[in-house]
Amino acid sequence: MFNFLRTDPTPGMTAAQAIPLVEAGEIVLIDIREPMEIAMSGKAKGALAIPTAALAMRADPRSPECLAELKSGKPVAVYCASGARSSMAKGMLARMGHEVYNIGGLAHWQQAGGAIER
């Protein structure tokens, strides 16, 4: 009945698995929340802040606005507040050709021991 509320059922990577990969520079981490959300709670250490509305422009390797980190060919992990928006972002990034994982929400990152930047 409420399938639209479900997050990605098969993320392929947990926040706990992503933490050492981000620290080692082996994966690109993207926070897709809005700037006001990030200002209120901080973001995962090492994450790029790219709100959902800017994702197509900033993450598509064919776009002149694409960030250099997203032209590297490295896998990408995305998160939001709960995992729902990052599930949608995962699909968008996959269509752009990225290997992408939804690691859920910022709370998942924190619960796994991930550091927060303010």
Segments predicted by a language model, with ranges:
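Short, surface-exposed ligand- or partner-binding patches at beta-edge/loop junctions that are enriched
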Residues: Y79
